[in-house]
Amino acid sequence: MKQLIMEMEEYASSKNVPIIEKKSIAFIMKYIKDNNVKGILEIGSAIGYSAILMASAKEDVFVTTIERDEERYMECLKNVKKCGLDKKINVVFQDALDVNLTEDLKFDLIFIDAAKGQYTRLDAPISFSSLTISTYLA
């Protein structure tokens, strides 16, 4: 998986795809381990870099990640499958503002890594039914 992560970093750099900084993902991965995080909702998948790293932080972590850009969504799916985490990462192709997660889901962590200019619009419009949230990182 280390090789895939390096390839993803190179891809992101060459295609100007924003990915999380190494210090930030290291902090999040430590948080996941230290706080027994099991369910993660990520808004803004890009190429799947952070979802893959978060899902690999612990054996029992499951990530639902949402991406609205079709090219990035396809790249994310490819990378998730390539690293063998397709059973631990659910990639959703939709705008986060239109998502309605109606299943009974429990997220211990919500990580918003979407278009930074849209953060203020993400606060209320996302509709969750029977959702428990423990931690929210933006």
Where in this protein do the model-derived segments appear?
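A short alpha-helical cap/connector motif
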Residues: 1-109, 116-131
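Conserved beta-strand signature within the Rossmann-like core of class I S-adenosyl-L-methionine
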Residues: 133-138
